[in-house]
Amino acid sequence: MRKIKFFDTTLRDGEQSAGVNLNLQEKLEIARQLERLRVDIIEAGFPASSKGDFEAVKQIAETVRTCSVTGLSRSVRSDIDAAWEALKGGAEPRLHLFIATSPIHMVHKLRMTPEQVIEAAVEAVKYAKRFFPIVQWSAEDACRSELPFLAKIVAEVIKAGASVINIPDTVGYITPKEYGEIFLYLQNNVPNIENVSLSAHCHDDLGMAVVNSLSAIEHGATQVECTINGIGERAGNAALEEIAVALHIRKDYYQVETRLNLQEIKRTSNLVSKLTGVVVPPNKAVVGKNAFAHESGIHQDGVLKEKTTYEIISPELVGVPSNSMVLGKHSGRHALRNRVEELGYTLSDEEINQLFVRFKELADKKKDITDDDLIALIFEEKFDHFKDFYQLSSIQVQYGTNQIPTAVVVLKDGKGNEIQEAATGAGSVEALYNTLERCFQTPVTLLDYRIESVGGGRDALAQVFVKVRAHDIETSGRGTAQDVLEASAKAYINAINRVFMIEAMRGENEKVATP
């Protein structure tokens, strides 16, 4: 049975989603979870694009041991050199090279002739092979390329040493039948193509990324590139969880196998959603909250009698928990640490100690602490602190039906200086955000505001997600507290801290368009 490798690009292509800006700690946590999911390859970033990306790729390569870590590179030596410096400490360093091959890209973007493109691709592969044991080569915008030229350049890069050939549908243009035919054409027209692995990379602009990826697998691809929850630029990428479960449930049809641990899918989906702020639609296949819900009376009756009447995927297959452990104010540090590890999170002794303090504070106000509560506390403790930027000291909001909402906020900056401001607004949240904007002394545009309850009950934690734009940077933030307004303030501060973090970490190089 053929083995299909999963190449996860959540940390590279997925992070190109509008408003998604992950910090180093968040990227490392996602990489560790992808390792638990047992993906074959993690594309950790684009090392030459910025200092922040370089450092993230380097640390992920040095941390992950049971799967290969790769980075993206243009077909230029400086990019390849940067990628090698970032990836050389990995368990299996590999490089992902790309260059555009469609007429529209060669003429208008590269301004190169087809012969020049072939020469650049071959030279880049040969140079990369001096360092990397595995070189993957991608034909950007392959699906709008002329097939004879595509076959010619693929043949040349194979001769130069590429061992993986990726055929990206960069703009989500292709149909399943056409995509499969490209793979067949290459297999029939490229010498020695049987000695390399063929890879699929699909975008979802026409809603066909997953089915196109499956078509590629049917027609000879042995690697598929995808992201968790299908996040990515524009309409997103092919969703890893949908492809993986389709291959498992319909193994009779596809006749392939993977090394994925499917029981880690739901946990991975939740982690990526929380850290990126990208909501998983309720009706999303495999990981949506309604994926296993049955509303129809006839369906409910059938499922109660025999699950397989209306349920082709069991919740347990993808790690949807049937119950959760409840902790309380009498639970000790050891029980807390054990549960944190069972939930799949890695915390240092210092982080556990700080989490235990927050846990006890919440346990004094809330009788039962569920897994959802604990995860919210972990996120706040592990990912939402920016010690070098603003931290909330206190808020006070006055509101009444016949009063103008007024907020008073006290913040501390990275140097420990105290900042106090007050402002009014049409509502409590606006008053709060107007006050915070005065503290930051910078104009901020609120693009989105969303509030969720963590679990049920009147004593549930509130979790607020915001998306903002400041200094021409669009980013998201999150905050958790029992009080809605405190959670709202934390989310806004978290988002602004990310803006300042991005500005501080920006290198001289700007982000580059990629496949």
Curated annotation (Swiss-Prot):
Record: residues binding Mn(2+): D13, H201, H203, N237
Pathway(s) where this gene product acts: Amino-acid biosynthesis; L-leucine biosynthesis; L-leucine from 3-methyl-2-oxobutanoate: step 1/4
Pfam family, one: HCS_D2
Enzyme Commission code: 2.3.3.13
Domain of life, source organism: Bacteria
Entry's transmembrane regions: none
GO MF annotations in UniProt: 2-isopropylmalate synthase activity; acetyl-CoA C-acetyltransferase activity; manganese ion binding
Alphabetized SMART domains for the sequence: LeuA_dimer
One GO term describing the cellular component: cytoplasm
UniProt xrefs under InterPro entries: 2-IPM_HCS-like, 2-isopropylmalate_synth_dimer, AIPM/Hcit_synth_CS, Aldolase_TIM, LeuA/HCS_post-cat, LeuA_allosteric_dom_sf, LeuA_bact_synth, PYR_CT
Pyruvate carboxyltransferase domain span: 4-266
Recorded catalytic activity of this chain's protein: 3-methyl-2-oxobutanoate + acetyl-CoA + H2O = (2S)-2-isopropylmalate + CoA + H(+)
Cellular localization per UniProt: Cytoplasm
A GO BP entry: L-leucine biosynthetic process
Record region (Regulatory domain): 391-515
CDD domains found in the cross-reference section: DRE_TIM_IPMS
Database matches in PROSITE patterns: AIPM_HOMOCIT_SYNTH_1 (PS00815), PYR_CT (PS50991)
Keyword tags: Amino-acid biosynthesis, Branched-chain amino acid biosynthesis, Cytoplasm, Leucine biosynthesis, Manganese, Metal-binding, Transferase
Principal EC category: transferase
Cofactor(s) recorded in Swiss-Prot or TrEMBL: Mn(2+)
Family: Belongs to the alpha-IPM synthase/homocitrate synthase family. LeuA type 1 subfamily.
Known partners and oligomeric status: Homodimer.
Role according to the record: Catalyzes the condensation of the acetyl group of acetyl-CoA with 3-methyl-2-oxobutanoate (2-ketoisovalerate) to form 3-carboxy-3-hydroxy-4-methylpentanoate (2-isopropylmalate).
The name this protein goes by in its record: 2-isopropylmalate synthase
Species annotation: Geobacillus kaustophilus (strain HTA426)
Gene: leuA
